[in-house]
Amino acid sequence: MTYMLLIIGAIILAIFLGEKFDVNAGIVGVVFAYILGSFMIGLSTDEIFALWPVELFMMIFGVSFFFNFANENGTLEIIGHHLIYAFKNHLFWLPFGFFFAAALISGLGGSIWGSVPIVGFLALNIAKENNLDTRIIAIAVIEGALAGGVFPFGPLGAIVQGLIASTGFADMAQEISWQLFIVSTIYPILLLLFLMFKDRKNDAYKQVELKAPEAFKPKQKQTLTLMTIFIGIMLIFPIIDNFTGGSIPFIASISDSLNLGLMGIVFGVIAYMFELADGQKVLNRTPWSVIWMTCGISLLIGVGVQVGITESLAALISYVPWPIIPVTIALLCGCMSIFSSTIGVIAPLFFTTLPALYATTGWSPTIMAVCIIIGGFAATVTPFSDGGSLLLASSGYLGKDQKDLYNTLLFRVTPFTVGSAAITALTLSIIHSI
């Protein structure tokens, strides 16, 4: 228990120091991992180096390297505009245009850091010009970006798979990733439907005028083709292998050899050779801050795992009444996510507890993983977290408009999304218990 408090305290202090001195919390996490690991726990430096999450690092880098070609040459932005424009004759459903545009851009490599600024700027200015409900728009853009981000072959999906692969449920990593993606997509869609039908008497949508998007240029068409091939390969061989039960050795061998991060690097090099975008600018887009945040905190947690912090945390959670453990996890992750990153901090901490949680509580690791993510994502809409701060920064709003958006995110959107995540977690736990 002492080590658990020490490691959690180190994580909190790393986040605080990162904010205070504008340094990446993951780098501070590496410092604490070294100090605590070597001088207090007694690990050798070789043992600490061995805890560095190599597969997680390669997954984030590989996926971002390839998909950043589509980000750099404008393919993702045009895809988003085409998707929004498809709703020109169905303007009541326009929030779903924003949702799916953000999800698609995020899932195809833009991640939340690319999709929220692209779609958010367009959506919020349409909202301002036509007096649309910014609560609906904010949820559509941010939750769409988050849902698309956990697409198993997307940037956040790669991180999730890498984190799960480091637990005792590595063989379930892809299955859990797909279920996370499905739940993370369905539940915000239900939220939007609820809010939209409450707002159905608002005639403002009828006044919206959408501009026709640009046509795809040759390089963008080539990029789109390469992305389709990449996703096809990553999907088709595992599906055939599962369908045939591994009875075709050639297919089984390819399926076992496919690695999301390494395949991303392969396709990134192909895109580089075809000059689909300026290669140096693509490399400059590498999300090093995310890589350092996630891997650095994972290293610190890895040091704690060596002295049993996951078992201690799971034992502490097991004192919660069994039926409400999933809801408690979702709310706890939601509260933590207000001031920290779900993928960079919360997921590395709680995913490591999945084997111990399963052993002590009997709850399915899939249910627990889903509750961790949807709980964390629910509070990402706050102005202090990734989604809300990105939306504020990219809105183009000034003065009173910006203050109103800030208040909407903090007081109207956050309680609604966190409460909805708790209800979703409760619903999933009831279904699982039947």
Range-by-range predicted roles:
Residues 1-59, 67, 182, 189-309, ...:
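Hydrophobic transmembrane alpha-helices of multi-pass small-molecule transporters
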Residues 4-9, 27-30, 92-100, 114, ...:
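Hydrophobic alpha-helical transmembrane segments
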Residues 14-23, 101-111, 142-151, 331-345, ...:
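Transmembrane alpha-helix interface/packing and boundary motifs in multi-pass membrane proteins
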Residues 43-130, 137, 280-359:
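Membrane-embedded alpha-helical segments and adjacent helix-loop junctions characteristic
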Residues 55-62, 175-189, 255-259, 366-382:
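Alpha-helical transmembrane segments
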Residues 60, 68-73, 90, 94, ...:
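Transmembrane alpha-helical segments of multi-pass membrane transport proteins and ion-pumping complexes
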Residues 126-217, 364-371, 389-434:
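Membrane-core helix-loop-helix motifs of multi-pass transport proteins
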